[in-house]
Structure formats: C-alpha cells, structure tokens
Amino acid sequence: MSTSRRGRRTALLSALTVPVVALLLGASTEATAAPAASPLSAREINAVNTDIQANNHAMGSQIRRVEGDQSTPETKAAAQQPQPAAALPNQVAATVAGMDVASYQGNVNWGNWWSQGKRFVWTKATESTSYTNPYFAQQYNGSYNQGFIRGAYHFATPNTSSGAAQATYFVAHGGGWSADGKTLPGALDMEYNPYGATCYGLSKASMTAWIKDFHDTYHAKTGRWPVIYTSTNWWNQCVSGDFSSTAPLWVARYASSAGTLPYNWGYYTVWQYTSSPLDQDTFNGAYDRLQALANG
C-alpha cells in the first residue's frame, strides 16, 4: 500500500462517526460512536470498508476459512477443562478463560466479558507494515482498565517485508511489552495466506528464517520472546524450524481437543478453541501462571 493511500485511509478512519465492519455481538460490543471530525459520504465509508476488508485479517480467520470450525457447545465446555500434555503429565490442574479481538468487534463491552469469566485478551495491533487497528486503544486500554491481563498481536504477511521490519512496526504501534504484571508478550500470528499461496510463496527454510527474524527482533526490542500463534496443519506445511525452547505456543484448533501440536512443542500455552461467536481461548494453567507469563 502506498504512503498516500495509507494516509488517506488513516484520515478517513479518524473521521468515522460509527464503527466500521464491527460485528454486532449482542452484549459483547458497544455501538458507541466516536466524536466525528467531519461527516463522511457513503462513498468514503465504502472505501474504508473495502480497505479494511483487503488489508485487515483477524486472528484465525484464515484457519477457519481453510480448516473449518467444528466447535460445538460440548467442545467449548471441554476446552475449559485441564488437558495435560504428555510432556507434563498430571501437572496442569487449572485453566483460565480468555479471548482475542480485532477491529471487527469495534468498541468492546469489557464489563460484559469480565462478568462471563474472561480474564485475558490479545487484541490485534498491526498487519504487515501498513495496517493498524483503529479500535486498538479502546480494546487494549479498555480491557486493561477492566482488570484483564492483555497483550497485542501482529498478523504476519511474510511476502511483503522482512520479519525484522514487521516486528519493528508492531512494537512501534502497540505491540511492546512492559513489566506491569498485566501486559502479555506480543503474539505473532502465522496462518494461511489470505492473498494467495498457502505459504506466501516461501520455502520451509525461508519461512523459518522469516519467523526467526521477527522473533529475534522482537526480543531485542522488548526483552521478551513473542508468543507464536498458528495451527498445526499450517505450521507443518510451511515451517521447518524449532521455536519451542523460546516461544510459547498458542495453537488454533476448533474441536474437542488441541490435538497434535506443531513440531517439537510438548505442550501449548494457549488454545484458541472456537471462533463463535468470537475467538475464545483457554490458558493452559492456573491464574498465577498467566501472571508469570505477563511478568516474564
């Protein structure tokens, strides 16, 4: 996306009088209008909608597109139960409920989700080096003020710029980390290419190098290793490297269990177990271990 186009989109977004492309999830969202800088024509609003649809992809959107969502009320209930992995037999005795959001949720009613037992959230901050979530401040700061342990995530497009460039952009636009006990390390969202070839036209070795570039740059800038979000099917098709010794795994699988994990991870830290009515997650441990992840 050109600089002029990005500037035009930013100006249009700042002038919106209603949330754009927000999902109306009953009590889970608020349709609170931001103060209008100037009225927009229908043509301008449509241009913003088109741009968001072309340049903004929520976490798991491409996994759901390719792999489907087989979650049911029964599988969602099962996801809330401890599921110790072979690497940690009988050691996981608790879980913590969480969620992740993007611009599609608009202004989120954090009190509602808190009352439903959610205690952590990651919100989308960036995609590539051209997109920032226009609702990021409300989602990131609003959840924090409600009491959530919160973090930010970056939707990767490995064919558009280097891992270092995208990590730098992410940190500069909300993806940093602070040792306040309530901020999670940033998450790197690695999933199917929404624009074309599954692995973005990269070999497994090249994709591994790209992820390492992001992973190392993020660590250099924040002192934390990023959480890696992915599905086992995508990872095993596109990546050959091993990040299990540094990066906590956030696995996506919309079924009754997290299933087989990506290469060499012995257990998952977070499991995204459904995308309905929005992305919901479970932390694999007790609340004090979630706090430990935030504290580093």
PLM region spans:
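Substrate-binding cleft of extracellular glycoside hydrolase catalytic domains
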Residues: 84, 89-213, 219-221
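Catalytic domains of cell-wall/extracellular-matrix polysaccharide-remodeling enzymes
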Residues: 182-264
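Short acidic, gly/pro-rich beta-turn/loop elements at beta-sheet edges
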Residues: 109, 162, 238, 261, ...
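Flexible, glycine-rich phosphate/dinucleotide-binding loops
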Residues: 130, 159, 235, 258, ...
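Short alpha-helical interface patches
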Residues: 4-7, 110-115, 191, 205, ...
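Functionally critical loop-and-helix segments that line ligand-binding/catalytic clefts
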Residues: 37-105, 242-296
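Secretory targeting and sorting signals
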Residues: 1-35
